[in-house]
Amino acid sequence: MQTAIIDYGMGNLHSVLKSVRTAGQLAGKNTEIFLSGDPDRVSRADKVIFPGQGAMPDCMAALKRDGLDEAVKDALKNKPFFGICVGAQLLFDHSEEGNTDGLGWFGGKVRRFERDLRDPQGCRLKVPHMGWNTVRQTQNHPLFKDIPQDTRFYFVHSYYFAPENPETILGESDYPSPFACIVGKDNVFATQFHTEKSHDAGLTMLKNFLNW
């Protein structure tokens, strides 16, 4: 079995690779886990992980430059697929960041947090949303195995996804209002938070993906 981590020059790639390989050991899987920017090699993989970090316009431009956008679209149709952070945002129709069109797997937009966010006590909240936050699982999913409700994951983002179809929302967090932070449809699962930075909970989720 082969698991490809898409390398288009945008993202915490080596940290993701290290975490997924650790998760593979925990899963007891005999799987080859590798970084690749080769569309053909990505297309031959059994599972695909799509990380991303940085500005969405730059990420989309890099994806198209390397000819990986079509490989991603093909993988979305029929392979277990895990999008992380901007890799998750790229799966939506459109982003307010740079007025950028996404890949359109999920209907909806990626929106920016308001500039004057305040908590219930009236204290101003910083944007980007950065640090640990609890995640509510709103539906059952195989990737939640052995992950308790309200587990904390690590976030770094100024934009969040707003799905058109509420049935695609698998998890939510609050900053300070609820926002979708996990979405899924068929063979595709995607998180706004960074699994590779989320310690044991992130490793468990990646292990569950490799077993999915």
Swiss-Prot record:
Keywords from the UniProt entry: Amino-acid biosynthesis, Cytoplasm, Glutamine amidotransferase, Histidine biosynthesis, Hydrolase, Lyase
GO MF: glutaminase activity; imidazoleglycerol-phosphate synthase activity; lyase activity
Keyword Oxidoreductase: no
Protein origin, superkingdom: Bacteria
Glutamine amidotransferase type-1 domain sequence ranges: 2-212
Listed EC numbers: 4.3.2.10, 3.5.1.2
Active site: 85, 194, 196
Catalytic function, reaction form: 5-[(5-phospho-1-deoxy-D-ribulos-1-ylimino)methylamino]-1-(5-phospho-beta-D-ribosyl)imidazole-4-carboxamide + L-glutamine = D-erythro-1-(imidazol-4-yl)glycerol 3-phosphate + 5-amino-1-(5-phospho-beta-D-ribosyl)imidazole-4-carboxamide + L-glutamate + H(+); L-glutamine + H2O = L-glutamate + NH4(+)
Pathway named in the protein's UniProt entry: Amino-acid biosynthesis; L-histidine biosynthesis; L-histidine from 5-phospho-alpha-D-ribose 1-diphosphate: step 5/9
BP-aspect Gene Ontology terms: L-histidine biosynthetic process
InterPro entries to which the protein is assigned, alphabetical: Class_I_gatase-like, GATASE, Imidazole-glycPsynth_HisH
Location in or out of the cell: Cytoplasm
Record-level GO cellular component terms: cytoplasm
Pfam families xrefs: GATase
CDD domains the record matches: GATase1_IGP_Synthase
Subunit structure, interactors included: Heterodimer of HisH and HisF.
Task performed by this protein: IGPS catalyzes the conversion of PRFAR and glutamine to IGP, AICAR and glutamate. The HisH subunit catalyzes the hydrolysis of glutamine to glutamate and ammonia as part of the synthesis of IGP and AICAR. The resulting ammonia molecule is channeled to the active site of HisF.
Protein name: Imidazole glycerol phosphate synthase subunit HisH
Gene name in the database record: hisH
